[in-house]
């Protein structure tokens, strides 16, 4: 029997999907990311979405101002696609190095997506330009038709929206974000180098039974919602396969405690504090630690055409206890796996 490794050294990872929010929430949650991750793709769905070069630059400056001393962190900004976005604004932002990618939210699919796109074929000219200049398209892959069951919205999105986009724009780089189903995993595995996907720790570790059996656990509620066990197992198999089309994207999405624990709670899991130990635990369970570094630190840069990070992080087999809550002014944020212990810690 092979001895269990006691340390893991990997290239410093990047987070290819995160919500950093703004103001006090930003300054509270950012250090948990900037301490471990070198770069992060920052979602643009603020209450006032990031749709212009100027607003992206201003938001980037607010993020950089909140990075603690001693942390080396680069936020990678994204443009929020709307029905009326000017193609020149998108192109200018990408060519100036302000926008790394553009984000497609179907209108009302998730938090702060009311400004999202209601008629996707109408913005095909944006996709055509993005394909031409090599700008990645990041997609929240769920249909929003009220007649479609919430557990079926990702699978339906593939057939109705994603496949037509890929057929029309075959060389458009697309990230199918936070995938949650066997349908999505199989679709990405069957794809080509222009299609990638991010996978969150919560969708690898849990399924809908964990959220709903024996009481509702609101801190596991996110969108896309956790699916049945068969889908969870398919995601685990996909990341364990070593395919270079899957990479780390936490979708860490903090909300104040009272906004999660309510009669109509917000969707989002704040997993940044435990993200890397959580992924390591999953890969170890799957006997796939040999693929951890690629998933966390190599596949994403390769897809985006960016250099890998020079420095390394070290994970050590030391119990890591997640706090029950994290102060947020007069309130608090409940982290993913609150009060639980993971087998791996990031060496500081």
Swiss-Prot record:
Homodimer. This is Dihydroorotase. It comes from Yersinia pseudotuberculosis serotype IB (strain PB1/+). One of its GO terms (cellular component) is cytosol. HAMAP family: PyrC_classII. It catalyses: (S)-dihydroorotate + H2O = N-carbamoyl-L-aspartate + H(+). One of its GO terms (molecular function) is dihydroorotase activity. Its cofactor is Zn(2+). It is an enzyme of class 3 (hydrolase).
């Amino acid at each position: 029997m092979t001895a269990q490794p006691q340390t893991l050294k990997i290239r410093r990872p990047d987070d290819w999907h995160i919500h950093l929010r703004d103001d006090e929430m930003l300054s509270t949650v950012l250090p948990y990311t900037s301490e471990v991750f070198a770069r992060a793709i920052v979602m643009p769905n603020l209450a006032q979405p990031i749709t212009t070069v100027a607003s992206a630059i201003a938001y980037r400056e607010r993020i950089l101002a909140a990075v603690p001393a001693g942390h080396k962190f680069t936020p990678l900004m994204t443009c929020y696609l709307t029905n009326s976005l000017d193609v020149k604004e998108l192109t200018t932002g990408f060519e100036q190095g302000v926008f790394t990618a553009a984000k497609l939210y179907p209108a009302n699919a998730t938090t702060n997506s009311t400004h999202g796109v209601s008629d996707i074929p109408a913005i095909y000219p944006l996709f055509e330009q993005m394909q031409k200049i090599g700008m990645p398209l990041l997609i929240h892959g769920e249909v929003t038709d009220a007649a479609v069951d919430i557990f079926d919205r990702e699978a339906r999105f593939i057939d109705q929206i994603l496949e037509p986009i890929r057929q029309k724009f075959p060389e458009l780089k697309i990230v199918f974000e936070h995938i949650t189903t066997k349908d999505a995993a199989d679709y990405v595995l069957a794809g080509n180098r222009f299609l990638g996907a991010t996978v969150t720790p919560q969708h690898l570790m849990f399924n809908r039974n964990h959220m709903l059996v024996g009481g509702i656990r609101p801190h596991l509620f996110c969108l896309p919602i956790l699916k049945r066990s068969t889908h969870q197992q398919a995601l685990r198999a996909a990341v364990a396969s070593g395919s270079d089309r899957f990479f780390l994207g936490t979708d860490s999405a903090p909300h104040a405690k009272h906004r999660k624990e309510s009669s109509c709670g917000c969707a989002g899991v704040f997993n940044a504090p435990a993200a890397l130990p959580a992924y390591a635990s999953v890969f170890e369970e799957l006997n796939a630690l040999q693929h951890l570094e690629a998933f966390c630190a190599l596949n994403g840069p390769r897809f985006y055409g960016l250099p890998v990070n020079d420095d390394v992080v070290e994970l050590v087999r030391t119990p890591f206890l997640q706090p029950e809550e994290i102060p947020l002014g007069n309130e608090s944020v409940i982290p993913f796996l609150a009060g639980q212990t993971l087998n791996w810690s990031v060496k500081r």
